[in-house]
A protein has these predicted regions:
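Conserved helicase motor core of SF1/SF2 NTP-dependent helicases
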Residues: 2-138, 142-227
Length: 227
C-alpha cells in the first residue's frame, strides 16, 4: 500500500497501555498534568511519551513535539565530526525508529520534520529560546545535570506540556554533585501540583522477558541484593 505524503491522526497506530503504570501515565497525561516517567529500560517510557505527545499534536491541541537530550558524553555536539544533521543522527536514531513504528511508515520521521510537527534539540542549543504551544520531552533525563534541567523547564512559554523520561539508577554521571542535582530537581517537581511522578518497575518491562530478566539481575547486583 502506498504511504501517505502527509501524515494525519488516522495514520497513527493505536497504542494501548500494557501495564498498570503505563495506564497511569495515559490517565495522568489525559488529566492535563506534566509527567516524570522514571524507571528501568524497556518499560516503554519514551515510546509512550512520543505516542501521547504526537496524538495531542495531531488533535491540534499543540503545534509540535520537541525532543530534548543532553549531548552526553561530549555534552556538546560541536566535538562530533560532520554536519549538524550528521551530528544529530547519533541522538535522533531511537526517535526516528519509534516514530516510524508509530505511523507504520519508514519515512514517518522525515515527514513530521518537514511538516514541523517534531523537532530535536540538545540542551546546548536551547538557551535563549521561548517554547510555545509545544510538548517538550526530555529523554534520557538522568544524563542532564541540574542546570540543564532548569534551563529546559524555564524555556516553557504559554500552552506547553513537559514530559521527563529517564532511569535515575543509570546516569552517566560520576560526580556526586551532578547526581545530587538530579535528585534535587526531582524533589522540586514532586512538590508541584501540576506534575505526576510515575515510577516504572521491573514488572513494567515489556520489551522482552529476556531483557526483563537481565535488567532485574543487573540491578539487584548493583544494589547489593545478590552476589
Amino acid at each position: 500500500m502506498k504511504k501517505p505524503t502527509k501524515l494525519r491522526l488516522e495514520h497513527l497506530v493505536k497504542l494501548d497501555p500494557l501495564t498498570d503504570n503505563q495506564q497511569l501515565a495515559f490517565n495522568s497525561f489525559a488529566s492535563g498534568n506534566h509527567l516524570c516517567l522514571d524507571g528501568s529500560a524497556g518499560t516503554g517510557k519514551t515510546f509512550i511519551s512520543l505516542y501521547l505527545a504526537l496524538e495531542s499534536v495531531f488533535k491540534k491541541e499543540y503545534d509540535k513535539v520537541i525532543i530534548v537530550r543532553s549531548a552526553v558524553p561530549t555534552r556538546d555536539m560541536g566535538f562530533l565530526p560532520g554536519t549538524q544533521e550528521e551530528k544529530e543522527d547519533a541522538y535522533t536514531a531511537p526517535y526516528k525508529a519509534i516514530v516510524n513504528d508509530l505511523f507504520d511508515d519508514y519515512g514517518g520521521w522525515t515527514k513530521l520534520i518537514e511538516d514541523r510537527k517534531i523537532e530535536f534539540l540538545t540542551t546546548s542549543f536551547i538557551r535563549g529560546i521561548t517554547l510555545k504551544k509545544s510538548i517538550v520531552i526530555i529523554d534520557e533525563s538522568q544524563n542532564c545535570n541540574y542546570h540543564e534541567l532548569c534551563s529546559v523547564i524555564t524555556r516553557l512559554g504559554e500552552d506547553c506540556r513537559f514530559i521527563m523520561a529517564g532511569d535515575y539508577y543509570q546516569s552517566d554521571f560520576t560526580r556526586k554533585g551532578d547526581q545530587d542535582g538530579i535528585s534535587q530537581f526531582i524533589k522540586i517537581i514532586k512538590n508541584m501540583r501540576e506534575f505526576d511522578h510515575i515510577e516504572f518497575k521491573w514488572e513494567d518491562i515489556v520489551r522482552s522477558s529476556f531483557v526483563r530478566d537481565f535488567i532485574m539481575t543487573k540491578e539487584m547486583l548493583e544494589r547489593g541484593k545478590i552476589d
